[in-house]
Amino acid sequence: MHRLALALLALCLATGAASAQSDWPTKPVRFIIPFPGGSFSDITIRIIQKKLGPRLGQAIVIDNRSGASGDIGSDVVARAAADGYNFGIATNSTHSVSPALNPKLPYDPLKNFAMVSLVGEAPYVLITRPDLPAKSLQELITLAKAKAGAVSYASVGPASLAHLAGELFSQMAGVTLTEVPYRSSAQSVLDTQSGRIDMQFGTMAPVLPHVLSGKVKALAVTSLKRAAVLPDVPTLDESGLKGFEASLWLAVVAPGKTPPAIVERMNREVRAVLADPEVVEALRKQGIEATPTTPAELRERITQDIAKWKKLAQETGISMDTEATGSIPAKK
């Protein structure tokens, strides 16, 4: 009799849990963004928010928790209640670069999160000063090889993805660049435009107007496919650096023990939103290409990225504490 009562209780609890998940969501859903308002992540999720809320039948509440290159907000997501009402935004910074370079990270990017879907990617643009005597990537490499350190490179933020892109370029091209550190990407673009700096990897949205106006030259983009907003600009991969990829990406994740049924539902809704032509166009205006995935595909992407940046860090000695040295040496 006691066993029968326990079995009935377990059945009731399971039925109740299944019912709660099938009725989800019954209240507003929180999205924790580990970066401030106006950031790449914030702009992207607010574009998604307009369509995702109505599809779920509940409001999407944006909660910006910035600090420590996104690590603080990501830790908040990892520790949040796994009840289906807390989701987070993951980026290269929080889920591949930091894990690869920071052994003291308070969260595990794979174990502490349930993967939902990749949302979008935004390649960097390799731009040069307008009068640099190089019209292609190969001409730039030839110029840099002619004299070590002759080509200057703007690096914004130590151990940032843009910094790692420069390290990867130097390594794969076999060149040595003179590194000039900047605190502001806006200032570095202006200095490239004025000729004070030879080249840099610039974020798509802010550099696009300068490229289209001819104030800087765009030699290549860092994605494996050409950017829709710059269809005539080749990728570094097709320009001779086979396999080069260093795009900004953004994804939706949840606390690790979030019920699979809720994760699957959120994945379906995010993918549906990213198929909406209005959303695709709004993202594209920000230099972002919609790139929805399955949870498994997102997990594989993060796993591969961590391995890539960890390998680069080991080979170059770069870390979260790296200070600009004035040059980026080629791999020997």
PLM regions with names:
Residues 26-28, 172, 212, 260-332:
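An extracytoplasmic/periplasmic, membrane-proximal ligand-sensing/linker region
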Residues 5-16:
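Bacterial N-terminal signal peptides
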Residues 207-275, 307, 321, 329-332:
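C-terminal lobe and pocket-closing loops
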Residues 40-44, 48, 69, 73, ...:
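Stable alpha-helical elements in mature extracytoplasmic
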Residues 52, 79-85, 92, 100-187, ...:
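Hinge/capping helix and adjacent helix->loop/strand transition within the periplasmic-binding protein
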Residues 20-111, 150, 174-199, 210, ...:
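N-terminal (or domain-start) structured segment
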